[in-house]
């Protein structure tokens, strides 16, 4: 069988290796740093052994390929990652500073309360959402150039508008100042309409259960590297995959037809087939070293794909010396009025009891600052220009200002508010380098934003032995996510060997049908399908009114 060289041991690279080694290929994986997992990895670097992570991520009911892969990876001798390493669904709530926290307790009926909308605002909110769901080409071309927050702004009052946009970073993963209407619509379409039935076995937390359409998201029952990537790499090594860490790709040799070799510094790497599963910023730099390669179809998309620059979402941990309880199980938070658009989760709510939180730590909250361009309340600086100390003080102040959070803490802790608990420290993911000139990460992160859809490359390139993987490539997931990464790795593997199975995203018949109608309307430059229906009803009403008046 042919030899496969994969650059990158993030989720996409590991997914491609997983599929190809099982089909008999000789697979080698090269990784720039000393551990796998990419932007989802965890680590324990401090003397207190406290776990840290790049950012916390959930897994939704439409993560079909991700869950399928997890079912194939042994966690231990008792079962798979899917069976033993996943939590039950988290309970995500919107936590404003002055109002009560609101949760998704009643399905779609909960949305007006969660986002502080009145009935008329909710109707207009759904009108915009429905337009994204019933568009195909129009959404990919036109709506991708529209900022989602700005698209909804004319239809919502200020309070509802700011509350609604606050969920974009924590849920979609792309901050509200940059995420497109297309990406936002695609995300909620899958979440609320996917045909999902992911069955889970009974465990210490209760009987067997099902994660269905619209259900809450799952987390790992421990740090991501310890509960996914380490077992996965162990499994792949047993299957024959060779891993080479701290080997960064620096150059690809191209003879005008194929890739003849690759370089990690001075070391020459050779194989029959190469898969680039590295972040697109680094890929763009490597391709620029070889203009003849950079100009190839699909590969020439990288430069415009990364033109918007890296995404800044800074993760942090709050370590407490006492256990803080919540009145609801597995409570996840969006601090909706925080300037830095903070999201939080207390890890001990879902982590196995044997997981070490760190020396003297009884409660460990993981959080993410989801927008970097809005000035904070203390220093009046955005995350982009804060020092590390200023960032930590801002995060602390914004969390302590959240009245909804403090109310729930008091409810579950005998009247004690958040300020009354001893905070040992606030830790920030170690790769972030703060500077007045601008915050930077050792590994720049890409996410979907306005005007990126047109530049997503396919997994198969015109170079017959070069393939691409990563959530920045074209997938049915359509969102930079764990599912998008797994799907892309599988699609890259399938482009090499058609025996690889990729699970498709479900599209309801009514959405598929109406989207096809809108494609016709878009071709003839007619209004969007929903707009056309509304316009027709208005004209019909006027005509009917005219007939009635004329007959009098």
Model-flagged regions — what are they?
Residues 2-29:
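N-terminal Rossmann-like FAD-binding beta1-loop-alpha1 element of flavoenzymes
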Residues 12, 35, 281:
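Conserved Rossmann-like nucleotide-cofactor binding loop
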Residues 21-44:
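Glycine-rich FAD pyrophosphate-binding loop
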Residues 47-138:
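Dinucleotide-binding Rossmann-like beta1-alpha1 core, especially the glycine-rich loop
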Residues 128-251, 255:
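Active-site/ligand-binding neighborhood in enzyme catalytic cores
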Residues 203-220, 263, 272-273, 278-456, ...:
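C-terminal segments that line or cap access tunnels to active or ligand-binding sites in enzymes
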Residues 251-269:
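Conserved beta-strand-loop-beta-strand element in the redox core of flavoprotein oxidoreductases
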């Amino acid at each position: 069988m042919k030899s496969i060289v994969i650059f990158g041991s993030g989720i996409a690279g590991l997914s491609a290796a997983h599929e190809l080694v099982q089909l008999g290929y000789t697979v080698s994986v090269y990784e720039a740093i000393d551990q796998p997992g990419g932007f989802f990895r965890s680590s324990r670097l401090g003397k207190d052994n406290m776990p840290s992570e790049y950012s916390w991520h959930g897994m939704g009911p439409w993560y079909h390929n991700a869950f399928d892969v997890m079912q194939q990876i042994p966690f231990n001798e008792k079962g798979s990652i899917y069976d033993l390493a996943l939590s039950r669904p988290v309970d995500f709530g919107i936590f404003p500073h002055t109002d009560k926290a609101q949760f998704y307790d009643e399905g779609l009926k909960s949305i007006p309360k969660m986002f502080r909308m009145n009935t008329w605002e909710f109707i207009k909110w759904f009108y915009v959402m429905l337009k994204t769901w019933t568009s195909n080409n129009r959404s990919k071309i036109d709506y991708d150039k529209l900022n989602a927050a700005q698209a909804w702004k004319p239809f919502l009052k200020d309070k509802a508008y700011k509350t609604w946009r606050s969920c974009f970073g924590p849920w979609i993963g792309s901050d509200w100042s940059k995420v497109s209407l297309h990406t936002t619509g695609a995300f909620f379409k899958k979440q609320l309409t996917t045909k999902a039935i992911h069955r889970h076995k009974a465990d210490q937390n209760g009987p067997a259960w099902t994660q269905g359409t619209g259900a809450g998201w799952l987390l790992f029952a421990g740090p991501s590297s310890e509960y996914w990537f380490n077992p996965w790499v162990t499994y792949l090594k047993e299957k024959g995959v060779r891993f080479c860490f701290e080997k960064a790709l620096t150059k690809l040799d191209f003879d005008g037809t194929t890739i003849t070799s690759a370089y990690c510094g001075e070391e020459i790497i050779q194989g029959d087939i190469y898969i680039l599963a590295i972040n697109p910023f680094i890929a763009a730099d490597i391709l620029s070293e070889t203009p003849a390669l950079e100009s190839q179809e699909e590969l020439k998309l990288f430069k415009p794909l990364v033109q918007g620059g890296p995404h800044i979402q800074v993760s942090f941990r709050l370590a407490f010396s006492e256990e803080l309880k919540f009145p609801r199980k597995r409570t996840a938070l969006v601090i909706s009025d925080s300037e830095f658009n903070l999201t939080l989760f207390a890890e001990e709510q879902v982590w196995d009891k044997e997981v070490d939180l760190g020396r003297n730590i009884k409660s460990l909250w993981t959080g993410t600052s989801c927008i970097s361009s809005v000035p904070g309340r203390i220093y009046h600086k955005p995350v982009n220009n804060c020092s590390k100390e200023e960032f930590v003080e801002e995060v602390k102040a914004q969390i302590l200002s959240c009245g909804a959070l403090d109310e729930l803490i008091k409810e579950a802790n005998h009247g004690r508010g958040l300020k009354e608990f001893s905070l040992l420290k606030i830790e920030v993911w170690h790769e972030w380098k703060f500077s007045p000139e601008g915050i930077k990460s050792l590994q720049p992160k890409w996410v979907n934003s306005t005007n990126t859809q047109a530049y997503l490359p396919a997994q198969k390139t015109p170079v017959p032995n070069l393939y691409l993987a990563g959530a920045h490539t074209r997938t049915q997931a359509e969102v930079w996510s764990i599912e998008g990464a797994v799907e892309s790795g599988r699609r890259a593997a399938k482009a090499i060997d058609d025996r690889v199975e990729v699970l498709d995203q479900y599209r309801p018949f009514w959405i598929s049908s109406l989207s096809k109608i809108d494609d016709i309307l878009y071709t003839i430059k007619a209004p969007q399908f929903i707009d056309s229906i509304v316009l027709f009803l208005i004209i019909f009403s006027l005509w009917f009114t005219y007939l009635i008046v004329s007959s009098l």
